[in-house]
Amino acid sequence: MQRQKIREIVIGTNNKGKLREIRDLIPKKVKVLSLKNTTAKSPKETSKTFKGNALLKAKYYSKLTGKICLADDSGLEIDLLNKAPGIYSARWSGKKNNFNLAIKKVIKKINLKDKNWKKRNIKARFKCALAIYGTDFKTVNVIGKIEGTISKKKLGSRGFGYDPIFIPIGKKITFGQMRPEMKHKIDHRFKAFKKIRKFF
């Protein structure tokens, strides 16, 4: 199978934040389709890795729509919590995708591990796996990551997910405080997308 240039792609996510960020990364000449006109539920994420779950979702939505699909699986790893929440990052937010709840859970678990954690840097990283799948397209599966630390409290209202508690390495503010144009030049999703940009 030849790797033809992609001119139309389905973004396999129901997460509005992810959809917005991925859409911003894809060249304007490419027609981007969302899942808003489909009634399918998200597939069960049964893999133990980000790359495995991204591919699982790309295959599922490609077969559902009959089109080439790009899917994302991403999350936050915190060293003090043995790399949790990791692949379960979204699930920590509950059925209603309440990331305020997820952030409170993170802080609570860190507190249980180390009551003096605010006096030191808690190492963490964001990871993003991107997979492209289509019937006549050779599968692509890549990962990007950015190292950083957990902030002492929730800061900022931009972005989504765990952005308000993650300070990327070399910066003094959280992703939640950053302007989107700044975040999108350094984050894990941008780093993963750089590896697949040539296919568009």
Question: Which role does the model predict for each range below?
Answer:
Residues Q2-G12, K16-F200:
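Anionic-ligand binding patches
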